[in-house]
C-alpha cells in the first residue's frame, strides 16, 4: 500500500485520508474524531491550490508583461506597423480553443494532469527564450502562436489539478483563490513592463529577461512544489479503500475486486466521451454557450466608454487594469458565494452584472462615475463566472473526464464569445454603439432568467458522490 | 486505525523528505533567477542612463526652422533622441536644428506643428499635441493607443491614427482609431470607422474594418485606407467630412499620400505572394486621373511608413536600421522608380516638408 500512497504525496493524501468524513453516502454518523479540525480544514483552501495560483501568477506576470509591450516593441523597436501584428493575433484565436480540449483529454487519458500542464507552461517559457533572439515579425509571430498553444494545453489540466486538490465543498472558493492570484499576475505584468520602459527607454531585452525569469519560476514552482496528483487513481482509492477500511465488501455489486491491481495501474475508471451525453452536462454546455453568445468582448465596452468621454480615453490603456483589480479582489468571495448559493446560480446571475456594465457604457451620462461603475461590474462579472464555470464543471462530471469536460466548457464559452464579438460588431455598425449595447443588455436580461430556469433547483449541482449532503 | 498504517507512515516520511528537498531546490532556483534578473536589469539601467545622458553625435545649427526645411523626429542615440528636429530643404544631410519637443510622429506646416507622443510611466498614456510657431502648446487631446500616423492640412485639420491594441489573451486583435480634429482640438469626425462606407456604390459595414493613413485633399475631402480582413480588401477610399462617407476608389492601396500637385498618390503596395501571413510593402504611385499604378520595386526592402513627398518627383519614407533598430533613416526614392533609394536624412523618422 505504501507505494500507492507515495504516488500521491502531500496534499493528495488529504482527500484519501479524510475520505470517510467527506464521502456522502456514508450511512453511519461521522466519526467523532476531531470534528472542529475537519471543519477548519474544509474551510481552508489547500496549499496545492495556492501553489497553482502562484504558478499562474508568475506565468501571467511573464506573459502579460510581454503581451502589453509587444505592439510597442514591434512598432517602436522593429519599425513595423501594428497592422502586421494584428495578423498574428487573429491567426491563433481558433487554434487555442481546440488545444484546450486536447490538453484536458490527454490529462484525463494519462491521469497525469500535472505533467500535461507542465508541458504547456514549459512551452510558454521556451518562447521567452526565443523572444531574446527573435528579430523579425515571422519569428515573433510563431513565438506568439506557440505561447498561446502552451496556454491552451495547460488550462484544462491545471483546473483538473485544482479540482482534485480542493475539497468538493469549497471548490468554488478554491477556483476563486486561484483566479485571484492569476489575475494579480495579469495586472502586475503590464505595470512592471511599463515601469521598466519608463526607466530604460529601450529596455525590451530587460522585459524579456524578467518575463523569462518569471516563467522559469512558474514552471519550477509547478514541477517542484505541486504534487503529482492522480485524480482518477485517487477516486478509485477513495471508493475502494474506504469501503475496505469500513470493513465493507470492496464492491457493491461490481466486479472491480478481481482485477484490482490491474485497474489501479490503469488508473481506475477509463476515460469515456459518454459524459457528453449526460443531461446535466449538455444543459451546462447549453447555458454556457447561450450566455457566451451574449458576452461581447470587453474591448467593445472600453471603446464605447472611450467614444463617450475623454476620461476613458485618457485612461484607456488602464481600463483593463481596473477591471482586473476588481476581478482579483472579488474572485475568492464570489467563489465562496457560489459554494453557498449554488455555482450554476451564481454563474448565470453573474451575467446580469455584465448587462449592468453594458448599461453603464450605453447610458448618456459621461464621466468618471459611470466608467468606474462599468469596470467594477465587468470585474465582478469575471469573478462570478470564470472560476465558477470550472468549479461547476468539475463537480458535475466524473473524475475520469474532468479535464476534458473543463476544456470543453471553456472552449464552448470562448467560441461563443468570439462569435458574440463578431456579431456584436455588425450590430455596432448597423445601429450605432449606444443602441447595440442596449440591445445586448436587453438580450442578456432576457437570457439570464431563462438560463436560471434551466439550472433551477440545483439541476447542475453535482449528483451525490461529489457533494456533501450536509453542506 | 489498522495495521497497514505503519508502511503508509513510512511512505509519508519518505514523501515528506522529498517535499523538503523539492522546496529547497525551488528556493535555490528562485535565488538564482532573482539574482540573474536583477543583475541584468541593473546593468541595463546603467547602460541606458549612460546612453541617454551622452550627447547625440549630430551637427547642430540655428535658424534652420526660419527657412524652408524638413521637420522630423531625430533618432540619433543620446540625449536628443526622439526630439523634433529640422534640416534645411536644400541640405537634407546637413546640420539640424533640434527643438525641445519630444514626439513619436510629427507633422508641420511651418506655423503649426502636430506632435503625437507616448507618455511613458507605470501608467503609459498617449496624446496628441498642437504647437504654434514658437513651440508653445495650443491644444492637446488624449489618444487611445500607440501613435501611428499624423497629418496636418493647410486648412487647419489634423488627422491622427492610433493603434488600440489588445492587451490580453481574451481580446480580439487590434483596431485602429483614426480621427480628424481641428488645430484648436475640437473633434471634427469622431472615429472615421463610423463613417458610411460605400464599396462600388453599395453600403457595406464589415465588422473588422479599420481606417488609417489620412491624406488631405482640401478642407472637406481626404484619402485614406479602409481594411477589412473578413472581406479581404484593403481599399483606397475618398472621404467626405461633411457627408460623413468613405467611398472606395481602388483595392490594394495602403497608407496613401497625396503629391504636392494633387495628381498622384504614393502608397504602400503589398508585394507579398498571395496567402502569406505577413505583408511585404513596396512603395508605389497611383495616377489619380488614369488609376494607373507604378510599383517602385527599385526599393526592395519592406517599407512600413506613410510616404511623404519631398517634391513632385521624390518620395521620402523612414526605415529602421537592421543592426540598430531604434535608429531609423529617412530614405528618398524617385517617384518614377528610375533610380535606387538613398539615405536622405540620416537618423530621422516621420519627415514633414515645410516650404
Where do the model's predicted regions map?
Chain B
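Sequence signature of WD/YWTD-type beta-propeller architectures
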Residues: 2-355
Amino acid at each position: 500500500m505504501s507505494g500507492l500512497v507515495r504516488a500521491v504525496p502531500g496534499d493528495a493524501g488529504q482527500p484519501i485520508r479524510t475520505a470517510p468524513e467527506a464521502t456522502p453516502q456514508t450511512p453511519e454518523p461521522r466519526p467523532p474524531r476531531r470534528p472542529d479540525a475537519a471543519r477548519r480544514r474544509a474551510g481552508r483552501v489547500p496549499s496545492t491550490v495556492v501553489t497553482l495560483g502562484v504558478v499562474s501568477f508568475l506565468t501571467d506576470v511573464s506573459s502579460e508583461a510581454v503581451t502589453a509591450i509587444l505592439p510597442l516593441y514591434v512598432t517602436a523597436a522593429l519599425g513595423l506597423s501594428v497592422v502586421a501584428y494584428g495578423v498574428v493575433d487573429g491567426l491563433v484565436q481558433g487554434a487555442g480553443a481546440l488545444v484546450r480540449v486536447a490538453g484536458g483529454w490527454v490529462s484525463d487519458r494519462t491521469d497525469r494532469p500535472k505533467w500535461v500542464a507542465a508541458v504547456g507552461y514549459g512551452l510558454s517559457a521556451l518562447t521567452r527564450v526565443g523572444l531574446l533572439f527573435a528579430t523579425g515579425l515571422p519569428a515573433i509571430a510563431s513565438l506568439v502562436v506557440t505561447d498561446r498553444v502552451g496556454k491552451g494545453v495547460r488550462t484544462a489540466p491545471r483546473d483538473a489539478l485544482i479540482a482534485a486538490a480542493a475539497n468538493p465543498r469549497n471548490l468554488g472558493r478554491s477556483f476563486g483563490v486561484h483566479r485571484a492570484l492569476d489575475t494579480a499576475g495579469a495586472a502586475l505584468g503590464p505595470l512592471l513592463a511599463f515601469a521598466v520602459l519608463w526607466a530604460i527607454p529601450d529596455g525590451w531585452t530587460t522585459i524579456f529577461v524578467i518575463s523569462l525569469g518569471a516563467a522559469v519560476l512558474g514552471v519550477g514552482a509547478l514541477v517542484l512544489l505541486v504534487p503529482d496528483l492522480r485524480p482518477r487513481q485517487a477516486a478509485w482509492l477513495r471508493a475502494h479503500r474506504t469501503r475496505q477500511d469500513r470493513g465493507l465488501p470492496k464492491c457493491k455489486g461490481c466486479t472491480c475486486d478481481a482485477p484490482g491491481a490491474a485497474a489501479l495501474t490503469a488508473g481506475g475508471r477509463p476515460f469515456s466521451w459518454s459524459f457528453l451525453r449526460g443531461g446535466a452536462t449538455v444543459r451546462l454546455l447549453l447555458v454556457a454557450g447561450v450566455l457566451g453568445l451574449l458576452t461581447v468582448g470587453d474591448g467593445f465596452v472600453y471603446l464605447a466608454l472611450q467614444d463617450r468621454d475623454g476620461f476613458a480615453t485618457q485612461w484607456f490603456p488602464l481600463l483593463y487594469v481596473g477591471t482586473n483589480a476588481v476581478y482579483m479582489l472579488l474572485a475568492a468571495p464570489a467563489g465562496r458565494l457560489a459554494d453557498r448559493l449554488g455555482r450554476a446560480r451564481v454563474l448565470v446571475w453573474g451575467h446580469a452584472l455584465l448587462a449592468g456594465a453594458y448599461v453603464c457604457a450605453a447610458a448618456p451620462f459621461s464621466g468618471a462615475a459611470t466608467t468606474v461603475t462599468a469596470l467594477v461590474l465587468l470585474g465582478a462579472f469575471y469573478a462570478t463566472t470564470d472560476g465558477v464555470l470550472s468549479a461547476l464543471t468539475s463537480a458535475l462530471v466524473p473524475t475520469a473526464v474532468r479535464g476534458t469536460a473543463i476544456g470543453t466548457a471553456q472552449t464552448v464559452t470562448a467560441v461563443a464569445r468570439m462569435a458574440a464579438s463578431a456579431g456584436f460588431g455588425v450590430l455596432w455598425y448597423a445601429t450605432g454603439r449606444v443602441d447595440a449595447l442596449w440591445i445586448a443588455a436587453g438580450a442578456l436580461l432576457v437570457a439570464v432568467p431563462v438560463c436560471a430556469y434551466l439550472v433551477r433547483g440545483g439541476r447542475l449541482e453535482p449528483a451525490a458522490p461529489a457533494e456533501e449532503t450536509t453542506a | 486505525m489498522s495495521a497497514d498504517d505503519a508502511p503508509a507512515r513510512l511512505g509519508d516520511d519518505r514523501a515528506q523528505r522529498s517535499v523538503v528537498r523539492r522546496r529547497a531546490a525551488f528556493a535555490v532556483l528562485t535565488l538564482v533567477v532573482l539574482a540573474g534578473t536583477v543583475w541584468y536589469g541593473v546593468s541595463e539601467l546603467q547602460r541606458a542612463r549612460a546612453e541617454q545622458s551622452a550627447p547625440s553625435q549630430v551637427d547642430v545649427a540655428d535658424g534652420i526652422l526660419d527657412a524652408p526645411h524638413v521637420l522630423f523626429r531625430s533618432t540619433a542615440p543620446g540625449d536628443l533622441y526622439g526630439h523634433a528636429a529640422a534640416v534645411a530643404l536644400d541640405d537634407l544631410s546637413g546640420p539640424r536644428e533640434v527643438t525641445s519637443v519630444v514626439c513619436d510622429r510629427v507633422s508641420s506646416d511651418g506655423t503649426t506643428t502636430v506632435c503625437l507622443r507616448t507618455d511613458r510611466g507605470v501608467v503609459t498614456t498617449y496624446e496628441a499635441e498642437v504647437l504654434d510657431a514658437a513651440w508653445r502648446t495650443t491644444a492637446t487631446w488624449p489618444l487611445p493607443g500607440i501613435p501611428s500616423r499624423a497629418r496636418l492640412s493647410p486648412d487647419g485639420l489634423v488627422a491622427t491614427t492610433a493603434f488600440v491594441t489588445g492587451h490580453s489573451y481574451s481580446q480580439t486583435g487590434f483596431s485602429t482609431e483614426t480621427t480628424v480634429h481641428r488645430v484648436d482640438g475640437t473633434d471634427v469626425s469622431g472615429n472615421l470607422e463610423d463613417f458610411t462606407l460605400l464599396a462600388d456604390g453599395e453600403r457595406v459595414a464589415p465588422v473588422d474594418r479599420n481606417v488609417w493613413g489620412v491624406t488631405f485633399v482640401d478642407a472637406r475631402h481626404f484619402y485614406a485606407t479602409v481594411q477589412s480582413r473578413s472581406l479581404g480588401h484593403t481599399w483606397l477610399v475618398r472621404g467626405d467630412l461633411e457627408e460623413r462617407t468613405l467611398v472606395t476608389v481602388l483595392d490594394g492601396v495602403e497608407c496613401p499620400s497625396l503629391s504636392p500637385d494633387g495628381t498622384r498618390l504614393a502608397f504602400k503596395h503589398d508585394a507579398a505572394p498571395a496567402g502569406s501571413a505577413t505583408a511585404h510593402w513596396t512603395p508605389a504611385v497611383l495616377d489619380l486621373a488614369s488609376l494607373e499604378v507604378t510599383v517602385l520595386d527599385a526599393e526592395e526592402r519592406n517599407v512600413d511608413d506613410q510616404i511623404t513627398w519631398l517634391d513632385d518627383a521624390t518620395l521620402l519614407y523612414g526605415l529602421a536600421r537592421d543592426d540598430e533598430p531604434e535608429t531609423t533613416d529617412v530614405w528618398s526614392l524617385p517617384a518614377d522608380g528610375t533610380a535606387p533609394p538613398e539615405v536622405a536624412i540620416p537618423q530621422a523618422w516621420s519627415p514633414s516638408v515645410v516650404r
